[in-house]
């Protein structure tokens, strides 16, 4: 059974550190883990002009570039895609999905609070 949890909170509250350490611990214990991180619109960079980006720009729904060790995946999302639908479409074969952000989703959440935000 897949387990999905979202980690939300203000910047510098420990979300990324927690997700990274959970990923390490779960992976070391034999679990498969996917991490989905919400970022600001327009902040993602990809290699324009490279073949994988060209395929994506010309309409491929999914474009994967791989060097044999690491892969980069570009996916066109539908309007309103949330982590639940992204998970259903692409992350179906992992034990844990750790989501950083997506505070408005209906996913179970771990909420990080800093002294300044209390």
Residue ranges of predicted features:
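Phosphate-binding/switch loop-helix module in NTP-utilizing enzymes
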Residues: 75-105
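N-terminal phosphate/diphosphate-binding loop that engages ATP/GTP or pyrophosphate donors
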Residues: 23-77
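Conserved lysine of the Walker
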Residues: 15
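The conserved Walker
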Residues: 11
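Hydrophobic anchor at the beta1->P-loop junction of P-loop NTPases
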Residues: 7
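Conserved C-terminal guanine-recognition region of P-loop GTPase G domains, centered on the G4
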Residues: 101-118
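Walker A (P-loop) ATP-phosphate-binding motif of ABC ATPase nucleotide-binding domains
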Residues: 4
């Amino acid at each position: 059974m897949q387990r999905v949890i979202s980690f939300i909170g203000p910047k510098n509250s420990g979300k990324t550190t927690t997700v990274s350490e959970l990923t390490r611990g779960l992976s070391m214990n034999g679990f498969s883990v996917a991490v989905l991180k919400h970022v600001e619109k327009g902040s993602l960079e990809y290699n324009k002009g490279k073949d994988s980006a060209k395929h994506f720009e010309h309409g491929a729904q999914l474009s994967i570039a791989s060097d044999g060790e690491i892969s980069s995946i570009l996916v066109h999302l539908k309007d309103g895609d949330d982590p639940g639908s992204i998970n259903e479409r692409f992350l179906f074969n992992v034990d844990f999905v750790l989501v950083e952000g997506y505070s408005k989703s209906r996913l179970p959440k771990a909420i990080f609070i800093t002294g300044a935000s209390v």
